[in-house]
Amino acid sequence: NLKSNLKISIIEPSDKSLYQAAWTLVGAGAYDKNSTIKPMSEVMPSYVNWIKSYAETFLPEQNTVKTSDGDYTYDYLIVCPGLKLNFDGVEGLKESLGKNNVCTNYSAEMATYTWECLKQLVGGTLLFTEPPMPIKCAGAPQKIAYLAADHLKKKGKLNDSNLEFLCAKPVIFGVPHFQGPLNEICDSYGIKRSFQHNLISVDGQSKEAVFKQSDKDGNT
């Protein structure tokens, strides 16, 4: 039970609540895209004050948050910043997405295109990429690799496919406890791993991807 004198405000500009964690499953045809999207008004608690605005500046000495439509004071502040996608960070990626079998699961609409591509697969080369941190959900790029491999296996096309996971990190996952099991999963599906490979450009029409490879000291 909340104390009657407790006032909670949530600064959130979005009209929709997006369950982004499920977009990997949408990309694998295992989840409905529409089930990942709800009006923000339906998930916002009724007992809070919803400030539909962007937080722009913190003034901790003044216990104040500046937003796009005014200033708000507080006694306690909990900051939950997100990440903004930057498809322009890879040359040619923005222009290539959604066609010529160039996909991403970091968008609900694009995740449905991932599934359209997977459904039509009969083999070939599949590249799964993970950029440098920070990114949303470091496991997402490899989860779709496993799901795609399993889909190909069920279709009897895994042996006709060349799957490769190219990761900007020097290891498959940042938590050592999981590195062994994840590498075993890759081995079971025949997924090749290439670490310290960062995607820098895409040409969807010619189906070419260029990566920058670095050593443990960051030299390219």
Annotated model-derived regions:
Residues 36, 110-114, 178:
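Amphipathic coiled-coil/heptad-repeat helices and related helical stalk/stem segments
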Residues 25-29, 96, 181-182:
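Short, hinge-like loop/turn segments at secondary-structure boundaries
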Residues 39, 113, 147, 181-185:
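Amphipathic alpha-helical segments that form well-ordered structural scaffolds
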Residues 1-49, 132-176:
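Beta1-alpha1 glycine-rich phosphate/pyrophosphate-binding loop at the start
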Residues 40-45, 93-97, 184-187:
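Short, conserved catalytic or adaptor-binding loops enriched in Gly and charged residues
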Residues 48-57, 62-65, 150-220:
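A Rossmann-like FAD-binding core segment of flavoenzymes
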Residues 49-143, 150-156:
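FAD-binding core/adjacent interface of flavoenzyme oxidoreductases
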Residues 2-4, 66-71, 217-218:
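Short amphipathic alpha-helices and their capping/turn segments at secondary-structure boundaries
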